[in-house]
């Protein structure tokens, strides 16, 4: 509660100026690296006196951080089980998740897979604390399948590195795959996985600072 009171007082003082104050954002490592950095760069050039604080955590944990009033807003994957009714959600882009494998170690470029057939291969994915894990497990559960990953990590980049050396088939957002990728290929599926979204979320119960408004308007 004291966090929320202090935050409200600070935002009132900063309401009409961007000559100081702070901007507090939470996002996952993947979203920070592949989406957020260019916007942070632009905002910092426009408003160099605003102190920017970025908190790195899983998308689910980011929702809890937002609810506690520790940040102005979060950028997260959606759906996200951590989001509450008090959270205002706006979509900013869509993306697809893909299974990728090394062509050298898994020469399967011509094969089209069902989810059932994928279970015959070592699947690598983010750990259970992530929205990506929630999403993939729910897809398998809808088909009455039990997914038991070979490897669970907290980094999409590391999953991609392990896929390149043939340790398994990695499940990652498509925007993590370099455009000039030569070692990995995207597996073809007989079932189309739903599109997910990146969303910006703020707590409707808290005042939004001028800095946060300006940044969210850039997205």
Predicted regions and their residues:
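Secondary-structure junction motif
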Residues: 107-108, 121-143, 208-216
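Central regulatory/effector-binding core of bacterial HTH transcription factors
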Residues: 20-83, 152-153
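A late-sequence structural motif
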Residues: 35, 186-219
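Short beta-strand->loop
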Residues: 88-98, 174, 182-197
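Hydrophobic hinge/microswitch elements
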Residues: 58-71, 77, 131-187
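Short, well-ordered beta-strand segments
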Residues: 22-26, 74, 124, 170, ...
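Alpha-helical "hinge/linker" immediately C-terminal to small N-terminal DNA-binding modules
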Residues: 1-14, 98
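Flexible hinge/capping segments at coil-to-helix
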Residues: 16, 86-123
